[in-house]
Amino acid sequence: MIVDYQDVDTVISGVDYFSSYNGNIENENCKLSDLFEQNVNNQFFQPNNTSLPPPTNQQPQPQPQQWDLMEDENCNSSFENSPQQPTSPLLISSQTSYPSDLSSNSSISHSPIENQLLDNNLDINNYLNKINIFNNHFQNSDLINTTFFNQFENNNYINNNNNKENNSYFYNNNVNIPNNNNLNINNNNNNNNNNNNNNNNNNNNNNNNNNNNNNNNNNNNNNNNNKNTVYNNVNIPNNNNFNLNLSNNNNNLNLTNNNNNKNSVNNNNVNISNNNNNNNFNVNLSNNNVNISNIPISNYYQQAAQTIFDDNFQTIQFNKEYPLNEHISQSTNKRMKISHHSHSLSNNNENSLSQPYFNNNNNNNNENENVYNIVNEQNPTFNPNQSNTHQQQEEQYQQHEEGQEEKEHEEEEKYQKQKPKIEIEELININLIKEKIEKLKNKFENENVICSEFLEKCFKFSSFPIFPIVESKLKFYQFEIDFSFSSYIESQKLDKIGLPSFKRPVQFLNTFYTQEIVNLDQELITRSQPIHDFIECISLIRPLLSLSSSSSSSSSSSSPSSSNELNSKLNMVQSVFNVVKSYQKTNTANVILQVLKKYAKEFKSRRILSEQQETNMNLWFDAHVNNPYPEEDEKVILGAVNNLSKSQIDNWFGNKRMRDKSNKKSL
């Protein structure tokens, strides 16, 4: 068969069916045309020689999306988990619209669903919209099977004939997961009546194809009063097949005896399940599972009776790790208290249980007799044949609660009468202790004020970075430096230059330099004041910490330790600010020399140091013979002290190094 690849691409380009698969093509080099050429006989693609008419909207068609194809090395593809795919109406592109005059007599090949739509004069575009909704619903999902497509095409609901009179409806949704083992879940919701399920015929399923049979078996066990019931059969991979019966009863106690089921779970109620084959049982209290196994039947009856019917009206203690919601726990406790107090079980005609614990089975007659004996021994007033109304049960319960409150009130009165009276001597001792405490408070009131001030100043003091790393700069506080820029101009004899091109820049720089020095001086005062306050607080608080007298605390403010401590901190701060201001002065001096070189070349000459400057530099060099070449901070301090620029200091030490080398060689 000859296939026009271009027409096939046009038809398939908008198909959303492939978008529902999340797989990727293994061979990326395999072309789309090769796939359709080798799979042309696939029932999804059955094009005739006549291609579909072009779409009415001349818009660029999107590229085909990736789909889940299992390919071999020869690009032979096959759909995964679909040995026999149904004829899908999704062959029509959902991205294109066709003329409305299409009819069933057209020469174009359609799927059965398309032909049905055309015979009924239905609009294909509306049908395609439904397909898009369906595909979007199952997009990015791996739980897709042919059953969904069959249900979608047939568009039918599974109605149960036995429940048509009650206007009940059922939905049958099968979800298959690739595994041979399954889990069957039956949800029975009964909101008004007692539900007594004796499921002796629920067998475990071994194949994935038994889901519909399980639905029929479960529907026959449903009561006619259940108007809205949904059966959901979900097959989940598991090595052990088991049947799980979930019963929700919101108003009454639900007791179920399943001879073949291994586990019985009852949400929101107390459920007791007996397994006659293995003598094992499971007591499930709402969402808290208490599993007890391998216990004789007689012990089980006794423990069950003691758990539900307690003489002291004590409710079951639920596990704290899995707390129930408040509504369920309160309703369960109240129900159990009423059943303990009244012990009334009605007959089958009144839609209640025929026996106190289990159904009336021949195999359990002797066991149920043991239950009667146990309950009668614990409470002689218990009569299994007695049936009280709900109003009588409430009255009895209220009477019991009133009796309990009266007993508690009497016990409290007895306890109050037996309390020992406090002697008068003890009251006198308490008053004396209170007076002593008040005296101590008044005595140390001043100390408390000092402590509060100390803490407040510590908080303020911590906001200032007063103590930077200035170990190497601690020695710079002792230098007496004149930071006025006029001293540098006079020492360099720059004041004699009268050119306006030189004076204006110098005046401009001098203004900004002076303002910067004023700001630094103000910052020094701001940072020094907290140090004074902090040291003062230390001098006041130190006697309190050492438990010294108040008289010595006044004299300790001027102690040598406090004054030395204050001076050391202030010297550290002073050293830092001297270095900063020295950088400002030497850098400004370098700028002045650059201005002199540009605007007053005739006044530029070799700057010779004065005798005072030369003497100071030699003294510093001799004092640091072991390390005669200073760091950058030391250079700017020497330049600020001797009114030299940074470049002049560098040149002097460079020349000094060369002289030392020449002197050593001559020696």
From Swiss-Prot:
Record-level Gene Ontology MF annotations: DNA-binding transcription factor activity, RNA polymerase II-specific; RNA polymerase II cis-regulatory region sequence-specific DNA binding
Compositional bias of kind Pro residues: 52-63
Entry keywords, A to Z: Coiled coil, Developmental protein, DNA-binding, Homeobox, Nucleus, Transcription, Transcription regulation
Segments of skewed composition (Low complexity): 97-108, 344-379
Coiled-coil residue windows: 386-454
CDD domains per UniProt: homeodomain
Induction profile: Up-regulated by phagocytic stimuli.
Biased composition (Polar residues): 75-96, 380-390
Localization (cell): Nucleus
Protein known as: Homeobox protein 3
Annotated source species: Dictyostelium discoideum
Gene: hbx3
